[in-house]
Amino acid sequence: MFLSLDIRDYNAAAITVLKNQGNVLPVKGLDKRISVVTLGTTSSKNAFTETCRLYTDVDVYAMTEANMTSTLGKLKGSSKVIVGIYDKGAAYENCLNKLVLTVGSENVIPVFFVKPYDIGGFSGPISLCNTAIVAYENHEYAQEYAAQVVFGGSDATGRMPVSVEGVSFCGDGIDLYASRLGYGMVEEVGLDSEFLQQVDSLANLGVQKGAFPGCQVLVARHNKIVVNKSYGYTDKTKANKIDGNTLYDLASVSKATGTLSGIMKAVDDGLISIDGKLGTYTKSLAGTEKGKFLIRDLLYHETGMPAALNVYEEMTDTASYTGALVSAKKSAAYKYSAGGAYINSTAKVRSDVTSPVKTKEFDYRIGKRLYVGRETYDTIMNIIHNIPLRDNRRYLYSCLNFCLLMEAEENVTKVRHDKYVYDNIFHRLGAYRTVYRPLDFYKKSEIAPTEYDGYFREEVVQGSVHDETAAFSGGIQGNAGLFSNANDLAKLCQMWLNRGMYGGEQILSSDVVNTFVTSKSPNSHRGLGYDKPNLAKPEWSSTCEEAGPTVFGHTGFTGTCFWVDPENDMIYIFLCNRVYPSRNNKAFTEVGARAGIMKALYQAVERNN
């Protein structure tokens, strides 16, 4: 283990930045197209290209003299082209030279995985480029750390060991410092191999006991991701292994990552005030009791709104059945399995606000024979607007509060919520696998399924949001709908830890982030949109009992969570699909992997202090 750490340290320390005119490095503008080109290898997949993919969405091309013209054509429109050079030779120099002349010297970032003297053969194109990085050897660790330097995940303090005519003098090198998450080993951040064994043990136990078919676990500390592991499969067929790219339905984690991101940005831009009234932003509620809610009240869940909509009642045609709609037991009269119960066998979905086939009005598929559209969303929101309030405004967690928050955000920004958070938050972080409606972007096989719904959906839900309110809203709603992986969520969490700064860019103002991540309700344990440890009643807390008062995060019904600990400079993320194939899953609670790994993390911190 420590020998491996020493080798990693050696490779990381050696990386040398020879040129950085205009402070191109670390690469910024992750919301623009970035391409990676390999020269001197026929493969477009190696440790360098795969590490680049961890930072953002990149197009990768293996370039040769034979395909040079076609490759150059494909690179048009790229804001930056990162070139990994793995061998010497006139052919590769020619390719690099043509690439620089075609794409532009300020847009090409050459990274050399060759011996120092071999760089001399590239003196021409190097002289034209604004940047140049030397990693010295074609080794897995050199490739990993070179990519981290390009994107600001690792410091670069290396110096040229020799002089190379036309390129550099001995001792040349420019210091570059980390500005994004890096990737390292647990020993680098005060954790240990015992913790890794505990993670493996709990995650594998969860898979073996049927608590979930698979999961992702991520731990970051001191700006380094040191655990980023995947376990099991997406479902019981075991056709698709979980990997770092697998997308999970975040369920209510969407509230604190998707909706809250939009609200924070709107607050930052002066479009919303947390002490403003909801009726100011949603005019149809002005003059009503709900219109008097402060945005702060909605974030704290102190509005008197009921916990959720009964979507089964609201979206079922009342004329289609007699007797009770739902039964706890299966029978001939109640044969449709849905929502952990059974639905009346004669019940039918409302045909006035849905369609069994795709139409112009109902164009978003949420089930085998179920399409929804704008009219469906408007119906859901109208029900929320008119739903009776409880007789007090004491804390009660409510999905409906966040539906109202997303609606307010869209009203003031005049932009659909998903586009607003993509453009202003996620894409700037390089979090391209954080999406609503994931089937618009990714293959079904890349998405973990959730529950079998025998009534509304008539299938195992996969690629459509599990939550019924969000599903009938068209897959984009304030309470749920976001899909992501652990690696992407870590970028968002680190941005919060950095008080809005990530990759050298201020994504959100430090004042706004500080307000949201430090505020706590005087009436409950909740934060402004975040969950927090319940210190008064630890047995009711969503965190392990070791989590301190500065911790903030959220959990999701599908088995997801993230927790950020500013005091220990630490991020913990656990994603799984524990509701597959049914939410009636006692094993998830019995195994307790989600909270158990968090507890093991705090024990490791204490053990190594």
Name what the model sees in each region:
Residues 273-289, 427-428:
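Short, glycine/proline-biased beta-turn/loop segments that scaffold the active-site neighborhood
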Residues 551, 558-571:
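Short, surface-exposed beta-strand/loop micro-motifs that present aromatic residues
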Residues 1-188, 192:
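Preference for extracellular/luminal or secreted protein segments
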Residues 291-549:
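Short, surface-exposed loop or secondary-structure junction motifs
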